[in-house]
Amino acid sequence: MKHNIIELAQQLIRNPSISPQDKGCQQIISQRLAAVGFTLEWMPFGDTLNLWATHGNGDPCIVFAGHTDIVPTGDPAQWQYPPFSAIIVDEMLHGRGAADMKGSLAALVIAAENFVRKYPNHSGKIALLITSDEEATAKDGTAKVVETLMARHEKIDYAVIGEPSCSKYLGDIIKNGRRGSITAELYIEGVQGHVAYPHLAQNPIHTSLAFLNELTTYQWDNGNTFFPPTSLQIANIKAGTGNNNVIPGELYLQFNLRYCTEINDQIIKQTVATMLAKYGLQYRIHWHLSGKPFLSSEGKLVNATIQAVENITKHTPRLDTSGGTSDGRFIALMGAEVVEFGPLNATIHKVNECVSTEDLAKCGQIYYQILEQLLT
């Protein structure tokens, strides 16, 4: 299994599939899956390529999900090895996407391949959902595939996403949920004028200070057993023309909340509106909900994943919901149990991204054992 995983991972890394480009990665994967009897369905949306590949019928349906797109490399000269060389040095596979997530995607594919070879008449259905739009807007990728499947009344019971979940060593963390993410773009109105005549103007920076203080110190909740407390961060703030003699006419503020299951997006919107009204601010606001929080409590998939990780790594993993959003937020809308498990995330999105080849081999074994536990 290890040889096939590493060989496929290298093939994928050598294709510079900067999001939302796929650059032939899914074609490589689809040929392998077709050769072992998977039915292929291409779902292109906009500039994004998506693959839905299935084997078998009936319940339960377990999905292996991943993405072929990657983030840009930055200056290649800063890399120890060329970012698309997929070179192996001291059992470490180097290249953009090695850890996030072409390595674990290769492990998912080979695990599924090996499983259907051994169990061609397995119970239930195995599906692979692969997209080229996870790292960028994530609008035409998994979200659109899920919309299509729901419109066809298809069902997903379990989903394993190969995102790099581990922190210190392989097997320390399984992600069984994610916080919600919502962003606001707020424009606070003032009246532009000359700094020497403040009585003829209204400075939106000055009028917003009390609001900003309350916004950034407000305690949204205390979190719960599964999630840390909701947090808010201002990401961008702008006002003024750049001249020192002009009072700005408008202040622009962009802030993001990562929120837990104790509140929802409607509570967030209403709370902010109440704050703005309290300070008598004139404003325009636009909200963008990236994803609602989801949680897969201990059930068949979580338990099967824990067991497989313990069997292969000899470590007992911790269930965790920290970190950013993932495509799990879309799959969870179908009522599926969702877990994320993959290699270490220490180098993702960084110069000199790399992953242990031994860890990728173990990921493949873990994914294979999850299939065995749920479909045999």
Curated annotation (Swiss-Prot):
GO biological process, one term: lysine biosynthetic process via diaminopimelate
Domain of life of the native organism: Bacteria
Pathway the protein contributes to: Amino-acid biosynthesis; L-lysine biosynthesis via DAP pathway; LL-2,6-diaminopimelate from (S)-tetrahydrodipicolinate (succinylase route): step 3/3
Catalytic residue positions: D69, E134 (proton acceptor)
Keywords: Amino-acid biosynthesis, Cobalt, Diaminopimelate biosynthesis, Hydrolase, Lysine biosynthesis, Metal-binding, Zinc
Residues bound to Zn(2+) 1: H67, D100, E163
Comment on bound cofactor: Binds 2 Zn(2+) or Co(2+) ions per subunit.
Family matches, as SUPFAM superfamilies: Bacterial exopeptidase dimerisation domain, Zn-dependent exopeptidases
Cited InterPro entries: ArgE/DapE_CS, Bact_exopeptidase_dim_dom, DapE_proteobac, Peptidase_M20, Peptidase_M20_dimer, Peptidase_M20A
The enzyme's E.C. designation: 3.5.1.18
Protein purpose: Catalyzes the hydrolysis of N-succinyl-L,L-diaminopimelic acid (SDAP), forming succinate and LL-2,6-diaminopimelate (DAP), an intermediate involved in the bacterial biosynthesis of lysine and meso-diaminopimelic acid, an essential component of bacterial cell walls.
Subunit structure as annotated in this protein's UniProt entry: Homodimer.
Similarity section: Belongs to the peptidase M20A family. DapE subfamily.
Name used for this protein in its record: Succinyl-diaminopimelate desuccinylase
